[in-house]
């Protein structure tokens, strides 16, 4: 029956929080208004005085512990204890547990019947047998009573009635005593074999087995407010249980104290139930009091029955597999309970009823040891309770409680069979007299319960024996109790029109015939449903609304402000693939993950892709659904594909088939066997640079000075001295490019920042995303050029890293500082709008030079040549005539547009420039300059005032020194000799083009941008301006080279890990700050790889047909040259100044991440071969322990180097607070991983590994498994020893 509270909005705040915890506690406590429990308490006080007061207190504390654990299980797991037991144990075990719970309920109902019968006897003076019949017949009234309560909000009304009855009960017992005597000599414990029977009866009266299952079920029906965390709700339940059971103990103490004073001190013998009730004689003297007493018992009986009706049905269905109506359940229990009551009345009379009341409590106590094992095991199971697993202290208390129950039971059984105490003699005497029922029942109950206890003790939970099959992850705020839905989206198209709106605009996603769907099984938390979201795009400014999902959250955010001058309907095709698979909750591997990703803001295609990992079980093993993504480029008929590794299928649009693919049965934790082997090899290769197999620094690392992890290295310092306010020139050529890359943040670095308009030609060169990963120091950010060619609005602009001020109107059509290949579509669309498709095609075939002075008239189309260029890392295979050893660095980005003004002079120099120009494009590592002609041609037509300045120059204000620049280059260019820019000229030494010779004095022999984030210390970037007072002088302190090499090696290692099949699992764990930082670094590298792949494929697709065969061949090589992309990407290390995470501390965090991941894999690994590989890696990583855990470390905050567009955030990635700043860490994940955390994980790994066994009689089972376990156990012991000594320091 579904229950509910009254409207919570009308209740005070205290009641709204207290009722969900008080309700289940009160409904459970009403079962203690039971004559059987009174009889046990009074019997203990009458026979042993105050000796049993302290044991009764201990029993009460054990009851509080058991009920709290039961409630905690219900709150945390969202399932009741019976359901979990049915999942964790086999059918027969569950059946025996169900029988025990049913016996406990029948015993409670039996005592209730006897109590009601006694009340009717006292009230009306009828025969006791008749009263038992009448008490049994009241079960007929139960359906009416239950129906009435169902109509009147059963939970709330039942709770109120239970609370009222408990108050009456407590008040009646307390006022019946003229005074409450307290023993002044303490509460002595004098236990003996004679008190074993009384102890067992008190234990059964304090703890009832069926309440464990009932309480966890009632908790689910009394859900609290959604804004209360599980931890707070568990605490509320604890205090509610503590208060209620404290009141119960107070009543029992009063009864025992009174019995001790009345019977024990006077030597009277208590034989009948009326004698026990004589303790409350002051109350029973009034007929009204007797009537109230009978009504209390009557309603308590029905409330108990209703409680069982609400929660006990789960016990019958989960354990006994019985699905019967509620009224039939009630009638069955009542009939079974009436039979022994009538038998006792007919054979033994009033004395027999009293003995039967105590007998039922003893029988319940015999069931306790076997009943608490599932409760304690589940509450302490990490697989079931996850983070809410009980503490070690509570586990110890649970163990002591169990041992105490078992000890009392053993003493009782031994005394009952072999002892000579009075109660044992009476039982055996009744047997010899022919009445063997009670003795036989107790003996059978004890033996069967003991056997079940042994079976449960030897049978682990299923989740503990299948660590690699099931891990239950419940969210902190929401409980997942229904079957999980695995969603793979179906394809539909949506049409979206952009219009000019402010922040208050609303996002509208409309599809053909249907609106955007909302998934019913995804809980929207911490999101304002009224928050307006605007998705707008224009020709010049492209902003993409962030659509994020993180666990159970769906958050929509939009850019703060939009600036548009031209708006036109832009139809975007949004592909959403969806297919639904229902996976039962017992097979769920983890919480459902839905990734909603969007393409880059420059593209006009948004892909919303679902990324799901759900586990499916079959007869042979586990298989995983792969992640698929399909992304397209507008204007291209072919989809983006890549021939790279299959693990990047979500990046490049291709999913590999075969190997450890979707159909592989060798999947483990998201990684196939081959991927796990490659993971271990990659990590072993990386850490092998630093440490040997003993965790000691290698000699090679010392020689190369790579052992720098213990030194706090700082990035290089840059001092910027601005002596003048105006500049007639700026950094030119390569020097200018380098400075520009530091001043201008690339799209790859910050894709969604506001574009900055200016007339700086060099800033719009062909620099690509990864090449902008050099150090961007904050001091250089403010050294922003101001010249006559800049507008007033632009000159007042300041830059802070990748955050720019708003664009001015005159620079509206200028593209961002970094032009990626995948921006070509946006540029072409702009041209098409102004000129039409035919004009566009003509321009693409033969673009005319903008200015005759910028280059020869027969130069080759840069777009045509760039389409077929091949990415190179190192010397080019083909070199231009007259150039020797043409070495191109990825970081010294030589834009294609530079050839229009570098060395084109008259005469032989002009002729040499023609041939050299043609070959240059094939050896350039950068293709981004291909967009230059079209952009500037477009700008020249849109802005007439730029006719003389727009082109492929490299200065801020070319009008200031353009003439001297060209005269300088022309004068030094000879027909066959070395060009003048091979030397640093006095006037404009920085205005050199690219000429690479084997001359040791050549500028290009040093590869200046291979340094760590900044230029070589021998380079003075401002030297091209001479010694003028208004120049910028940079004092550069070269960083330690080993640090840069180490960080570059780290980047390569991350890229290799990302290429592993199923690598998403590695970077989707919710761990500490170190792991979170590495996950962010990986997300950044993943995004860069995605950008590179899209760019390469876009160029290859666009340039396939209209160009030369040699270009097509080069383009195909480029598309397949994945290794070249990787090497180019990691040829530098980003650095954004002070606070940047790219320092040696990042390597320490990576070491912690590696230890954590290897231990996670070892926890589920069952192959000795991979155990050995993990052992190698763990041996090397011993060197990290001292650095990571010897002293407390503060977590590094994410910097701008880790910024990625929110549209590319994966579901498990940390949420982005806004479009500019890096995402903040999640609450609770801001602490570094401690040694204690790893120690707990190591203990789990040891337990898991010890259970792995191979097939006996085989080489694997007899040799590989024992040897692998021995080696892995050895290194784990060393880790435990080292981490134990570092535990205090790391906390």
From Swiss-Prot:
TM spans (from-to): 18-38, 48-68, 96-116, 128-148, 155-175, 195-215, 231-251, 253-273, 288-308, 335-355, 356-376, 393-413, 441-461
GO cellular component: endoplasmic reticulum membrane; nucleus; plasma membrane
Entry keyword set: Cytoplasm, Endoplasmic reticulum, Glycoprotein, Membrane, Nucleus, Phosphoprotein, Transmembrane, Transmembrane helix
Entry annotated with the keyword Phosphoprotein: yes
Biased composition (Polar residues): 635-653, 759-768
Comp. bias intervals (Acidic residues): 617-627
A Gene Ontology biological process term: ethylene-activated signaling pathway
Pfam families: Nramp (PF01566)
Phosphothreonine: residues carrying this PTM: 818
Superkingdom of the source species: Eukaryota
Residue numbers bearing the Phosphoserine modification: 647, 664, 923
Residue numbers covered by motif Nuclear localization signal: 1262-1269
Region (Disordered): 498-518, 614-662, 742-768, 787-808, 836-856, 1210-1229
GO molecular function, one term: cadmium ion transmembrane transporter activity
InterPro entries named among the record's database cross-references: EIN2, NRAMP_fam
Keyword match Transmembrane: yes
Glycosylation sites: 227, 550, 891, 1027
The record's note on its domains: The N-terminal (1-562) region seems to be regulated by upstream components of the ET signal transduction pathway, and may in turn regulate the C-terminal region. The C-terminal (454-1291) region regulates downstream events of ET and jasmonate signaling pathways, and can confer constitutive responses to ET. The nuclear localization signal (1276-1283) is required for interaction with ETR1.
Family as reported in the entry's similarity comment: Belongs to the NRAMP (TC 2.A.55) family.
Cited function: Central factor in signaling pathways regulated by ethylene (ET) and involved in various processes including development, plant defense, senescence, nucleotide sugar flux, and tropisms.
Stated name of the protein: Ethylene-insensitive protein 2.2
Source organism of the structure: Populus trichocarpa (Western balsam poplar)
Organismal lineage: Eukaryota, Viridiplantae, Streptophyta, Embryophyta, Tracheophyta
Gene: EIN2.2
